[in-house]
């Protein structure tokens, strides 16, 4: 299990570097899907299966559709690919930054312990992620509404940023 979590965390770093280093929206979308899937896998490995499923469905159902629509409207004739010099340079810079941070924090890495949600299940009556969902819907209803409005505002901001010179993205087809 430790090897699987380590592999998932390394794949998460690779996916995030793929998003940050590539200026072309097509390849960055692939990095986003990899990072979202692997991040949900990390959550599953720590016991949050329901939360990871909800996050993955929200991501694929909403944000990726908006991103694909906006990327199609802001199409480049010759996007930069994975093997271009500038992209490889950015990848090397980000890998160097990750390596430096690993070197700085390597000493205290194994001193602390992460306990998964049901790591001490003999002392608990409830499952961690399902009781968290109940708390979110009972006490976090206002925050859920605020988050929905922020996502709607983000949609309009992205559509406004990707509009052309004379015609916007919200137009009659």
Curated annotation (Swiss-Prot):
Cellular compartment(s): Mitochondrion membrane
Membrane topology type: Multi-pass membrane protein
Give its E.C. classification number.
7.1.1.2
Question: What GO cellular component term, any one, is given?
Answer: mitochondrial membrane
Tell me which domain of life the UniProt entry assigns to the organism this sequence originates from.
Answer: Eukaryota
Determine if Coiled coil is one of this entry's keywords.
no
The yes or no answer to whether the keyword Nucleotidyltransferase is present is: no
Catalytic activity annotated for this protein?
a ubiquinone + NADH + 5 H(+)(in) = a ubiquinol + NAD(+) + 4 H(+)(out)
Gene Ontology terms for molecular function = NADH dehydrogenase (ubiquinone) activity
* Keyword line: Electron transport, Membrane, Mitochondrion, NAD, Respiratory chain, Translocase, Transmembrane, Transmembrane helix, Transport, Ubiquinone
Q: Which family does it belong to?
A: Belongs to the complex I subunit 6 family.
In Swiss-Prot or TrEMBL terms, this protein is called: NADH-ubiquinone oxidoreductase chain 6
């Amino acid at each position: 299990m430790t090897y699987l979590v380590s592999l998932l965390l390394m794949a998460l770093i690779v996916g995030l570097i793929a998003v940050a280093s590539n200026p072309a929206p097509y390849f960055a979308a692939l990095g986003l899907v990899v990072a979202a899937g692997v991040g949900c896998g990390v959550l599953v490995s720590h016991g949050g299966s329901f939360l990871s499923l909800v996050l993955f469905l929200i991501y694929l159902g909403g944000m990726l559709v908006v991103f694909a629509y906006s990327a199609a409207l802001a199409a480049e004739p010759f996007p930069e690919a994975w093997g271009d010099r500038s992209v490889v340079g950015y990848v090397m810079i980000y890998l160097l930054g990750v390596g430096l941070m690993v070197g700085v924090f390597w000493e205290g890495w194994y001193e602390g312990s992460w306990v998964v949600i049901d790591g001490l299940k003999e002392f608990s009556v409830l499952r961690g992620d399902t009781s968290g969902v109940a708390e979110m819907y009972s006490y976090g209803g206002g925050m859920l509404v605020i988050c929905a409005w922020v996502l709607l505002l983000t949609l309009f901001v992205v559509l406004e940023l990707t509009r052309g010179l004379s015609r916007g993205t919200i137009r009659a087809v």
